[in-house]
Amino acid sequence: MATKKLNDKDIMNLLIDTAIANGATSADCILSRSRGVSITRRLGKDENIQRYEDFDTGLRVFVNNNIASVSTNENSEKSLKEVAKRAVEMAKIAPEDEYSLIASKELLQQFPIQEDIFIDSYDSIEPSVNIIRDRASEVEDIALSVKGITNSDGADASWGEGETLLMT
């Protein structure tokens, strides 16, 4: 039988729900994804080309005033449940921290979230590898065009994007 692929919300809910079911008094979860491309050119030739795709989830668990934090890049239901259970066990033996808490609804109302604000702060179009290579070449060519410069340690160009989600 095929395993159901969990989406980001499912992953975060599973971690928090499992922590609560195993004795946590509260929990919050952060999930981040990023991807990108980087190219290094040296003396007109490709020296390094990298592509990355990262995924990481963090879980902070409270057992009264005892806190534990864990992170994982696993995304199977079985692994996530185990991570959440371990976090609760860690929190149970952690020293108390009376100053750490998840903000209550009352506290959050003092500083309401303005959900209608959206900041599109990046270009969402991924450039091709050739465009990134051309940008690195252009930078190196400019440096080498300076009178007296005869060698280069190379030039880098890269593109990346990421997103971070928080659930309480």
Feature names for model-found ranges:
Residues 1-168:
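Active-site bordering "gate/hinge" segments
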